[in-house]
Regions:
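ATP/NTP-dependent adenylation/nucleotidyl-transfer catalytic domains that generate, transfer
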Residues: 172-174, 230-231, 240-243, 257, ...
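Enzyme catalytic cores with a strong preference for nitrogen-chemistry domains
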Residues: 1-359, 377-386, 418
Length: 649
């Protein structure tokens, strides 16, 4: 359970209707399979001990006695099983019959959760046999009186009620509550109360029959509820073996976490699905959301259970590019939306200040290319001619012919006005003014060029009555890879919350959809150009200064950035996930090296982010000091760095 990962599973064993012993054998067989995978939370379907389709046989004492006996047998056989287990059966209580989820832990029955909402419509007639639970105080009942020896170490009254939260004694954030089938389909499911009272995982033991299209509706319910409640949701449904007299059960099992489907079974095939739910992330996300209610300490009864602490082997996958959807259709839709957000942000700013034009420094690189594409879209939306977009290319010591030519071609293809200002002479004059040797290629040599360009762009914007559009992206801002008061500064930064890995896809999307072959060719060549600030002289006419050789691969830094800010993960957890995700691409030494660089630069460069220009937020991670990141410029990175130093490779 290191880093908060809980190994969980949903199982659909084959049932024999009304044969509790046979069903118990199948349940135990599945439990033993899950034990091999070190599962800590095992969930079975509704009425898995009897079968859901017993109908009026549920009124037979013989079946009820057999179900109870089999529950005790399963409990006895799982004394050594290190897990919390949920199974379903009919249970007699206070003269009524209830449909319950029984929770088992190390041979003990630790709780009974009755179904609240009993369906009696369409194909369902459960009210014929079962009573619905009342939302009332939990009872502690001597269900085992006369069944076991009172001196037995497992003797205890068993809590019965809907308001139960099962809390792990070794890991308090591992909290579980249960609801049953129909409970999820009603306007106010019990899981709402469970979640806001501290349950990080909801289990649903279900027997949901199949109809055309019902599977997608169930999937939406489960993923949506996990997102709404910021919880893990495990759904185990009845499958093959149930009576097909009138219905068919497909065994659709699902494991979801905060809106993401971690695992789903193939329908019409019994079996087990596995995944790992990150309860630390769920707890952190709830704490971050100020509108999520504080946990009440009195409305639910806490029931303790125990599992051994161990490091969970991870099988769930994390995307290498968390900012970029992996499915092309979703990616294209996301790109279109982002371009519109950027364009609308710029449009509003220009209209507000009555701007007649816009200015951008065009280098032939990715970021300035994206900024120009956004400007073209904004001008189209405003009905303004694109020749009022003033592109300025400013070659200097490090400019290569490839980037220069691409800048010229790009502005021409988009119908923007292009001005060339060679800044070599101005920078050399500046070197003489400050007494700097131009043969010393240090930070002064580089930053003087960046600040000269910004001065030209600012003054050009004033001259043209326009706004200077910034080009810096989210990844550069996170690393502080920008010259303070140089390319760091603008009048409106359209790329400020777009990470570098996403910039590439936005430009690629524009190339694929623009309908202009010449423009597409230019954009594809820009995509193929190494990322560089071009502040050092080229070698043999080619780019000598490659950003990713200096600060590290952007795909790693974007991964680090996402899981640090969006998820709040610790450095060692990010390292673990990066090693898993980039296995075979980067070795552990490389991952750790650049992770240390990331934290060092992220903290040291906050002073640049503290005075960022305005710019539109486009995703869940942003660095604006006025919005998403309120961070002091002089905070110490020591405790994060200490964690990294303790990592053993």
């Amino acid at each position: 359970m290191k880093h908060g990962f809980i190994k969980v599973a949903a199982a659909t064993p084959r049932v024999t209707v009304a044969d509790c012993k046979a069903n118990g054998e199948e349940i135990l067989k599945a439990i033993h399979e899950m034990e091999k995978e070190h599962v800590k939370l095992m969930v079975f379907p509704e009425f898995c001990i009897t079968g859901y389709t017993c109908h009026d046989l549920f009124l037979q004492r013989c079946l009820l006695d057999s179900a109870w006996d089999e529950l005790l047998h399963i409990a006895d056989e799982t004394k050594e099983t290190d897990a919390l287990i949920f199974v379903g059966l009919p249970l007699r209580h206070r003269g009524k019959l209830y449909n319950v989820a029984a929770a088992l832990n190390h041979g003990r029955i630790v709780g009974f959760v009755p179904k609240t909402h009993i369906p009696n419509y369409n194909e369902f007639y459960e009210q014929r046999q079962f009573a619905g639970a009342e939302e009332e105080d939990v009872e502690f009942v001597d269900f085992l009186k006369g069944v076991i020896n009172e001196e037995d170490e497992f003797w205890d009254e068993i809590p019965f009620g809907t308001e139960l939260i099962f809390e792990c004694e070794e890991f308090p954030e591992f909290t579980v509550a249960a609801e049953l089938c129909e409970d999820l389909w009603v306007p106010a499911p019990p899981s709402i109360r469970h979640a806001i009272n501290g349950a990080h995982i909801i289990v649903n033991i279900s027997a949901s029959d199949e109809m055309v299209g019902k599977d997608s509706y169930r999937r939406t319910l489960v993923s949506g509820q996990s997102a709404r409640l910021i919880c893990g949701y495990i759904y185990a449904s009845a499958g093959e073996g149930e009576s097909t007299q009138d219905l068919v059960f497909g065994g659709q099992n699902m494991i979801a976490e905060n809106g993401s489907m971690l695992a789903e079974s193939r329908r019409f095939e019994n079996g087990i699905i596995y995944s790992e739910i990150d309860v630390q992330r769920l707890a952190d996300e709830r704490r971050r959301m100020s509108t999520y209610p504080a946990v009440s300490i009195c409305s639910h009864t806490r029931v303790g259970f125990s599992v051994a602490e161990e490091e969970t082997r991870l099988t769930r996958k994390y995307p290498q590019y968390p900012f970029v959807p992996s499915v092309k259709e979703e990616r294209d839709e996301r790109c279109e939306e982002i371009l519109n957000i950027q364009a609308m942000g710029l449009k509003k700013r220009m209209e507000h200040i009555h701007s007649r034009s816009a200015v951008v420094g065009l280098s032939g690189g990715l970021d300035s290319t994206l900024a120009l594409l956004v400007m073209a879209r904004a001008f189209d939306r405003m009905g303004m001619p694109r020749d009022q977009i003033h592109c300025v290319t400013m070659p200097c010591f490090g400019t290569t012919d490839r980037t220069y030519q691409n800048a010229c071609k790009l502005s021409r293809c988009l119908g923007a006005k292009l001005t060339e200002v060679n800044i070599k002479e101005a920078v050399n004059v500046h070197f003489r003014d400050i007494g700097h040797d131009p043969d010393i290629h240090d930070v002064t040599y580089e930053n003087s060029q960046a600040r000269e360009r910004t001065q030209i762009l600012m003054d050009t914007a004033n001259k043209e009555g326009g706004v200077l559009v910034g080009t810096g992206d989210l990844s550069e801002l996170a690393l502080g890879w920008a010259t303070y008061n140089g390319d760091h500064m603008s009048m409106y930064g359209v790329n400020a919350s777009v990470p570098k890995t996403l910039v590439r896809h936005l430009v690629r999307y524009y190339a694929d959809t623009c309908g202009d072959e010449e423009l597409k060719e230019v954009l594809l060549d820009i995509l193929d150009t190494p990322v560089s600030p071009e502040l050092l002289p080229p070698k043999d006419g080619k780019i000598a200064q490659k950003t990713e050789d200096l600060v590290g691969p952007y795909e790693l830094h974007d991964f680090y950035l996402y899981y640090m800010l969006r998820a709040g993960f610790t450095p060692d957890k990010i390292y673990r996930l990066a090693c898993l995700t980039f296995d075979g691409i980067y070795d552990k030494e490389t991952i750790l090296k650049w992770l240390k660089t990331f934290y060092r630069r992220f903290f040291a460069q906050q002073f640049k982010r503290s005075c960022l220009p305005d710019g539109p937020k486009v995703g869940s991670v942003a660095l604006s000091p006025r919005g998403d990141l309120r961070m002091p410029s002089d905070a110490s990175a020591r405790i994060w760095q200490d964690v990294l130093e303790k990592i053993e490779i």
